């Protein structure tokens, strides 16, 4: 009997002189004790040992050239009889994801999987051993030598590696909310009132290409400040971020609710200092069809930044403004359990970003236009996540540290004596995380 596509009926086979040939992905699903006289597997031809533990005996001859024996039980067997010929060039025994998790906590399970197919001497007749991905562990891949010795390893679980990107998203979005004085408040030099009320919105996209993560976000901020001296302005703001992320094997949402206090000094010589402290409560939720399963958690973020710059006036209303900024941010650790019962711990995340840049602008009748460029470097940026369930455990590490460039163009427009509008677009180049686009728009009213 030959079969190059489709299935042989499930169940017990007691046919005298039975010759079974499976090729090109054809599958025989066996659910009870069976035998064949001759078994030939080629090009993905598969014997699927389904159901409860049982045995398939090969009585005369087994030939395999890229054949597969798949099993959902370590107690199911394919046994090549004493007098049978064995011509195995390549034979893969494939186990389930649950077996991968079992191997993660006890490596000897891999040998048991290899021994699902044995020859007359009791040695494994397989040349390769693989599994699907588990809930915690990645897929196992091993090879069996001529003496029946097995060597192999577990890969990282690709779905869980993407889930570990939640920490990446947390740091990405928190770092993305860092902003200099001009992004937040526009051109304060044109604001002459004692008090200021302002609001702004940013929308953008951030990518972490190592995991195929994309996060699109909307950031809203509402603030109020007061002039406490000729040079200093003191204020506060509330903010809300709403983000939607996608990654291989899943998607998610991230929401931040926070507040900030700030102080800004604008001196007569063109120099300025801007200091801001921020807090946010962060909620993350994701859905995925594999790996550790769906999950959600919340944590807190803190940040403190200080910026210094000075504007130098040139001819024909042109000016240049060198800037330097240092921002420290932290996202607290988090613990949660997924829908599949996997325990997850995310370490606290630290970011220390230094920025050196400049803005080159021109005063126009309605306000100012400018271009800007900065180089930023995160001296920290490590993201670490740990997962475990029933003794199987793994960890995932990502490094968002290093440098990148930021480029932007924008304008500040005086809509009236008391009202100012500001708009800015930017993108980044290089770095572990990229921002293909972001725009920022705000309006400030002084009184």
Question: Model segments located where?
Answer:
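Generic recognition of flexible, low-complexity loop/linker segments
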Residues: 36, 80, 185-188, 359, ...
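Short amphipathic alpha-helix initiation/capping segments at coil-to-helix junctions
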Residues: 76, 102, 106, 118, ...
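Acidic surface patches and DE-rich sequence motifs
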Residues: 3, 41-42, 119, 131, ...
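Extracellular beta-strand/loop-rich repeat segments of large surface/secreted proteins
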Residues: 1-115
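Short, intrinsically disordered, low-complexity segments enriched in Ser/Thr and Pro
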Residues: 60-61, 108-124, 219-240
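C-terminal amphipathic "assembly/sorting" segment characterized by alternating charged
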Residues: 19, 28-40, 169, 174, ...
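Membrane translocator/pore-forming domains, dominated by Gram-negative outer-membrane beta-barrels
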Residues: 10-14, 202-447
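Interface/linker segment at the passenger-translocator junction
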Residues: 92-212
């Amino acid at each position: 009997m030959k079969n190059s596509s489709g299935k042989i009926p499930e169940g017990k086979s007691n046919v005298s002189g039975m010759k079974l040939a499976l090729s090109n992905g054809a599958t025989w699903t066996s659910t009870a004790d069976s035998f064949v006289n001759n078994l030939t597997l080629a090009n993905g031809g598969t014997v699927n040992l389904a159901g409860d533990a049982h045995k398939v005996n090969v009585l005369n001859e087994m030939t395999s050239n890229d054949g597969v024996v798949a099993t959902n039980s370590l107690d199911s067997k394919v046994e090549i009889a004493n007098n049978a010929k064995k011509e195995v060039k390549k034979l893969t025994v494939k186990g389930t994801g649950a077996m991968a998790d079992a191997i993660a906590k006890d490596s000897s399970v891999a040998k048991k999987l290899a021994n699902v197919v044995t020859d007359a001497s009791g040695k494994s007749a397989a040349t390769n051993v693989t599994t699907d991905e588990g809930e915690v562990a990645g897929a196992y891949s091993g090879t069996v030598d001529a003496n029946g010795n097995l060597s192999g390893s577990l890969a990282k679980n690709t779905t869980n590696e993407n889930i570990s990107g939640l920490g990446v998203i947390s740091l990405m979005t928190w770092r993305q909310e860092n902003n200099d004085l001009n992004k937040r408040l526009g051109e304060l030099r044109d604001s002459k009132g004692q008090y200021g009320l302002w609001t702004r919105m940013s929308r953008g996209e951030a990518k972490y290409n190592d995991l195929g993560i994309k996060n699109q976000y909307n950031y809203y901020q509402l603030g109020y400040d007061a002039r406490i001296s000729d040079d200093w302005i003191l204020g506060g703001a509330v903010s809300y971020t709403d983000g939607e992320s996608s990654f291989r094997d899943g998607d998610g949402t991230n929401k931040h609710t926070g507040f900030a206090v700030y102080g800004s000094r604008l001196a007569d010589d063109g120099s300025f200092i801007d200091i801001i402290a921020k807090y946010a409560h962060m909620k993350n939720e994701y859905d995925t069809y594999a790996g550790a399963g769906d999950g959600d958690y919340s944590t807190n973020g803190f940040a403190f930044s200080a910026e210094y710059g000075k504007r130098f006036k040139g001819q024909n209303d042109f000016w240049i403004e060198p800037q330097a900024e240092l921002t420290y941010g932290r996202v607290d650790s988090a613990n949660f359990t997924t829908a599949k019962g996997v325990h997850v711990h995310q370490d606290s995340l630290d970011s220390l970003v230094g920025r050196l840049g400049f803005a080159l602008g021109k005063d126009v009748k309605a306000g100012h236009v400018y271009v800007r460029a900065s180089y930023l470097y995160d001296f920290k940026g490590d993201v670490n996540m740990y997962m475990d369930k029933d003794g199987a455990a793994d960890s995932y590490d990502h490094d968002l540290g290093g440098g990148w460039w930021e480029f932007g163009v924008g304008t500040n427009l005086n809509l009236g004596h008391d009202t100012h509008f500001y708009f800015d677009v930017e993108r980044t180049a290089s770095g572990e995380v990229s921002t293909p686009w972001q725009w920022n728009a705000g309006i400030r009213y002084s009184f």
